[in-house]
């Protein structure tokens, strides 16, 4: 199965890593910037707050808690920290419950994610903006400046 993912930020990189764990999948990650995770490097004043030990539905302040509930139930704090540990990232928890990389630098998070993307079944398309997405009978087509990609699923 060919899975396309538009956006090379934290969510896009995580989705690509997760999808590529099944080696039968081919993953194409599209990012218009030349480098992946650029905004991630600036989060948390350059420290990158990964999670919070107090993360649960009681602390959700959005308009649709029913929408957030399945995600929080399925991939909570422990699962998040375990996922980052499996990628090789050490973390530290502050007394406030905030979780940061042990290095206290967002670059550590970006580096770990980029390293995890270095798999034979992941293709990175960077520095090229997606100009058109077209739904096809058998999946999708993504047009980038001068290139066209087809696949089965699109995130």
Indicate residue ranges for each PLM-predicted region.
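Glycine-rich active-site loop/strand segments that organize a redox cofactor
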Residues: 45-95
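Predominantly flavin-linked oxidoreductase catalytic cores and closely associated redox partners
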Residues: 107-108, 112-155
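Short N-terminal binding/cap micro-motifs at the start of the first secondary-structure element
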Residues: 12-14, 36-39
């Amino acid at each position: 199965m060919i899975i396309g993912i538009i956006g090379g930020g934290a969510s896009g990189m995580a989705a690509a890593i997760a999808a590529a764990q099944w080696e039968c999948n081919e993953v194409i990650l599209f990012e218009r910037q030349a480098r992946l995770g650029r905004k991630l490097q600036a989060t948390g004043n350059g420290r990158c707050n990964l999670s919070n030990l107090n993360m649960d539905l009681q602390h959700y302040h959005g308009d649709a808690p029913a929408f957030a509930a399945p995600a929080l139930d399925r991939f909570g704090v422990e699962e998040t920290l375990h996922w980052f540990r499996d990628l090789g990232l050490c973390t530290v928890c502050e007394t406030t419950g905030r979780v940061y990389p042990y290095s206290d630098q967002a670059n550590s998070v970006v580096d770990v994610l980029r390293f995890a993307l270095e798999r034979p079944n992941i293709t990175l398309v960077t520095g090229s903006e997606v100009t058109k997405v077209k739904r096809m009978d058998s999946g999708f087509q993504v047009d980038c400046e001068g290139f066209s990609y087809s696949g089965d699923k699109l995130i």
